[in-house]
Amino acid sequence: MTAVLMTALLVSAALPASAGTLPARTALERLQVKPASALVLARYERSKFMTGWRRDGAAGCDTRQRVLLRSDLSPGTGEECGGAEGRWYSPYDDRTLTDTAQLDVDHVVPLANAWISGAWRWSPARRHAFAHDLTRPELVAVSESVNVAKGGHSPANWRPPVRAYWCVYARDWITVKHHYRLSVTPREKSALRDMLGTC
């Protein structure tokens, strides 16, 4: 087992479980397949999901802070919502980072992709809950640069540069889409099957 894969597995162990109660391949086959709609995408606005990270809990930490706290590989700082420094592993591009300014919290299924996959029909409350979901494997700390490179792309057009992480990424993507009953495009489904082939 490579060092990259071992570190990725350590990080994923701290995150919500992938695939729920179904094997990923079974869950993938149950997803509705639909072509993407340019008309629906044209109506997408990030603000329909979130205008900032939600604060909740007794400590008042926001969602971003909670993701960084659970992903921090360094000893605790004693600060309830974490500090600006720590040690984070970005599994998409195999980088270890020590400054939160270098990090983004990625929506595994991007908000724009969720929108065209069915979230355009949801209530504002459901879209808000999706954007801040700490229960499913939807939020992961990664380097800012790799998150920018990913943008709103699905696996049909973007995959993590680290091939050893494809299996985890595909399972996470499928878990989120299956839970929220979001559709996939034919190319997206084909790409996910290919990525599951690395498991």
Label each residue range with its predicted role.
Residues 1-19:
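Secretory targeting and sorting signals
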Residues 16-58, 186-188:
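N-terminal module-boundary/linker segments of secreted carbohydrate-active enzymes
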Residues 21, 65-67, 98-100:
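Short low-complexity stretches enriched in small and charged residues
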Residues 27-34, 43, 47, 66-70, ...:
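Residues that form generic nucleotide/phosphate-binding pockets
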Residues 45-86:
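N-terminal carbohydrate-binding/catalytic regions of secreted carbohydrate-active enzymes
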